[in-house]
């Protein structure tokens, strides 16, 4: 069962867990855990995607309950009329607030995009970011005797593939758990000592104008146990009040590791 964050006669939003595909593709034909099919079975009607979240990213996923609703939502996303807010845990201390305007070359998958043009130039990519908190933990990583982490709020103004992950890597503050654009030593250390065994990127909030009622609509997604344990271990509880959960499974292993 997926957590339903919002539902009316036109729209439904769920809290997508990390590791779940939004929908099947021919590359993942045998995947059994898929958001769209699960939601369809859960609410008893078809759903229509309007946007996507990467498989390792968790958080708000908004869908239409008709093809028209899906189309209208997709149109709002394409025209950048929907405000998206994410939170991430990154390597190092990212403390400033700024806008990064750094064009990105399109990332092509060798199989899925084998017929796509490879000569496209960099595409505009803009992200507003704000450092919320920092911590230094007494755990050696690489040649450093301690490990530094930062909690960051992100608002992408464009929608390029892996934009937030690539922009933070460009800033030399990659997201913890990012196996493609991140720091592998930091990823291993975070997983071993603090239970950060996923991409620490969460789609916390969507704000939009309801396409049928015209009313403002804001949807928040709560954090999972991995996130809540990280906030506790790093002394960051209370910094994300709209997303933190009152109850969560407390860590039972050493150094914040979850027992299996």
Curated annotation (Swiss-Prot):
<protein>
    <recommendedName>
        <fullName>tRNA pseudouridine synthase C</fullName>
        <ecNumber>5.4.99.26</ecNumber>
    </recommendedName>
</protein>
<dbReference type="GO" id="GO:0000455">
    <property type="term" value="P:enzyme-directed rRNA pseudouridine synthesis"/>
</dbReference>
<dbReference type="GO" id="GO:0008033">
    <property type="term" value="P:tRNA processing"/>
</dbReference>
<keyword id="KW-0819">tRNA processing</keyword>
<comment type="function">
    <text>Responsible for synthesis of pseudouridine from uracil-65 in transfer RNAs.</text>
</comment>
<keyword id="KW-0413">Isomerase</keyword>
<dbReference type="Pfam" id="PF00849">
    <property type="entry name" value="PseudoU_synth_2"/>
</dbReference>
<dbReference type="InterPro" id="IPR006224">
    <property type="entry name" value="PsdUridine_synth_RluA-like_CS"/>
</dbReference>
<dbReference type="GO" id="GO:0003723">
    <property type="term" value="F:RNA binding"/>
</dbReference>
<comment type="similarity">
    <text>Belongs to the pseudouridine synthase RluA family.</text>
</comment>
<dbReference type="InterPro" id="IPR006145">
    <property type="entry name" value="PsdUridine_synth_RsuA/RluA"/>
</dbReference>
<dbReference type="InterPro" id="IPR050188">
    <property type="entry name" value="RluA_PseudoU_synthase"/>
</dbReference>
<feature type="active site">
    <location>
        <position position="54"/>
    </location>
</feature>
<dbReference type="GO" id="GO:0160149">
    <property type="term" value="F:tRNA pseudouridine(65) synthase activity"/>
</dbReference>
<dbReference type="InterPro" id="IPR020103">
    <property type="entry name" value="PsdUridine_synth_cat_dom_sf"/>
</dbReference>
């Amino acid at each position: 069962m997926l957590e339903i964050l919002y539902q009316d006669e036109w729209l439904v939003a769920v809290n997508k867990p990390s590791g779940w595909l939004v929908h099947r593709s021919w590359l993942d034909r045998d995947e059994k855990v898929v958001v769209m099919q699960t939601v369809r079975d859960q609410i008893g009607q078809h759903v229509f995607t309007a946007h996507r979240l990467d498989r390792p990213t968790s958080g708000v996923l908004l869908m239409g309950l008709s093809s028209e609703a899906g189309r209208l939502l997709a149109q709002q996303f394409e025209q950048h009329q929907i405000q998206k807010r994410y939170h991430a845990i990154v390597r190092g201390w990212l403390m400033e607030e700024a806008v990064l305007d750094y064009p990105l070359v399109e990332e092509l998958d060798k199989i899925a995009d084998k017929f796509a043009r490879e000569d496209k130039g960099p595409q505009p990519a803009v992200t507003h970011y704000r450092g919320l908190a920092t911590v230094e933990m007494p755990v050696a990583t690489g040649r450093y005797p301690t490990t530094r982490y930062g909690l960051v709020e992100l608002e992408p103004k464009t929608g390029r593939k892996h934009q937030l992950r690539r922009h933070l890597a460009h800033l030399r503050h990659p997201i913890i758990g990012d196996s493609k654009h991140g720091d592998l030593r930091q990823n291993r250390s975070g997983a071993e000592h603090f239970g950060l065994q996923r991409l620490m990127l969460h789609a916390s909030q969507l704000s939009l104008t309801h396409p049928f009622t015209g009313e403002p609509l804001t949807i928040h997604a709560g954090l999972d146990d991995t996130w809540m344990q990280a906030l506790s271990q790093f002394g960051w509880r209370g910094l994300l009040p709209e997303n933190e959960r009152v109850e969560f499974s407390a860590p039972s292993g050493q150094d914040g590791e979850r027992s299996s």
